From Swiss-Prot:
This is Aryl-alcohol dehydrogenase GME11368. Its EC number is 1.1.1.-. Pathway: Secondary metabolite biosynthesis. The keyword Ribonucleoprotein does not apply. NADP(+) binds at D69, S177, D178, Q203, R301, K302, P303, E304, H305, L306, K307, A308, N309. The keyword Transferase does not apply.
Length: 384
């Protein structure tokens, strides 16, 4: 039998990866964030006309991207609507892996009784998925996220309600965002004990300037077989080389600011100059190489920024680069991790201090991130 070779990828975005051990769908290594797709939030995020949005989506698709993230509240609903219109216009729904979210109320400010349009309960879920499928012009979403944990819904109600959608074919995989690790592990344990689909993805804020996920979330994802979708990887657009003037184009609300953007930019810029790459490439490569199954969510409105981010997929940081970046601010891993280990993220028994005093041991190496691809785009993946 003669096997036809696949079409060569146009960029590293077209070398797709398995999403997670618990989710075997294949996705592009970068996910296009839909928060900036729409014009309803122009005052806070800048202008994005439908023509601009479609150009960005076309560029993402043409370069091999197939993973798009949105939510029921983004841009007052325009994000889902425009993404759905773009997929329908080009007949690309089957090629794309689309995630959306529920929990935050899309009716804020409307003169109606809003009690059940938000939250993690069954009615909020029912209303949200109905409207999301209509807006996206599809009969299913690949991933449905719990957008944030509201501490109001019991785990059994949540997991059974989500799995009703799984059984109906309206949702393929489940994700959770902005929630404590203990909630996720408790929910996944309940799901497995009751023959239900567990969470396969976690979305949270993570970057060189905000490494909180290293305490509990990243180890949890690896133990649970989950992918990590970090947002804010590029400092919410505020990682900038000191050599370049601030245009003021990015208008980020104060709650999204960390306060370390300027100092971390200097550290990242020093590494970027050694590699002769943009500062954003270093910020992106750092997150991609920290753990396996990491798929950053990248926003923005300009195709040229997207193309620059794709180039980061070929950048391999050295151990010295990573150490330099992590000295950019004093990250405290906290108790009990600092008590058990050596001050960094614990990946296994090799990182536990009391064991190192008991002898010399060999352990199976922890799972690592995929190394940046080098050489021809069609060349086989190199050794880890």
């Amino acid at each position: 039998m003669a096997f036809m070779p696949p079409t060569p990828p146009k960029s590293l975005l077209g070398r797709h990866r398995l999403l997670a051990p618990s989710a075997s769908v294949r996705v592009s290594p970068l996910c296009l964030g839909g928060m900036s797709i729409g014009n309803a939030w122009q005052g806070g995020m800048g202008e994005c006309t439908k023509e601009m949005a479609f150009e960005l989506l076309d560029t993402f698709y043409d370069l091999g991207g197939n993973f798009i993230d949105t939510a029921n509240t983004y841009q007052g609903g325009e994000s889902e609507q425009w993404i759905g219109e773009w997929m329908a216009k080009n007949n690309r729904r089957s090629e794309m892996v689309v995630s959306t979210k529920y929990t935050m109320s899309p009716k804020t400010g409307h003169p109606i009784q809003q009690s059940n349009f938000g939250g993690t309960g069954s009615k909020s879920l029912h209303l949200s998925i109905h409207n999301s499928l209509k807006a996206l012009q599809t009969d299913y979403v690949d991933v449905l996220y719990v957008h944030c944990w509201d501490y109001a819904t019991e785990i059994p109600e949540l997991m059974h309600s989500l799995n009703v959608l799984i059984n109906q074919g309206k949702v393929l995989y489940l994700g959770i965002s902005d929630a404590p690790a203990w909630i996720v592990t408790k929910a996944n344990m309940y799901a497995r004990q009751n023959g239900l689909r567990p969470f396969s993805l976690y979305q949270g804020r993570y970057s060189a300037q905000e490494r909180d996920l290293e305490r509990e979330i990243i180890p949890m994802c690896q133990e649970e077989g989950m992918a990590l979708q970090p947002f804010g990887v590029l400092g919410s657009g505020l990682f900038k080389s000191p050599d370049k003037p601030d245009t003021g184009a990015r208008r980020m609300p104060p709650p999204m600011l960390i306060g370390r953007e300027e100092s971390l930019s200097k550290v990242l810029d020093a590494v970027a100059k050694r590699h002769n790459v943009p500062i954003t490439s270093v910020a992106l490569a750092y997150v991609l190489q920290k753990a396996p199954n990491v798929f950053p969510v990248l926003g923005g409105r300009k195709p040229e920024h997207l193309k620059a981010n794709i180039e980061a997929l070929s950048l391999e940081l050295t151990a010295e680069d990573v150490q330099e970046i992590e000295k950019g601010y004093d990250f405290d891993i906290g108790f009990p991790h600092k008590f058990l280990g050596f001050g960094g993220m614990i990946r296994g028994p090799q990182d536990i201090n009391i064991l190192t005093m008991m002898g010399h041991f060999d352990y199976v190496a922890p799972k690592k991130a995929i190394r940046p691809h080098q050489g021809e785009l069609t060349a086989p993946q190199g050794p880890a």
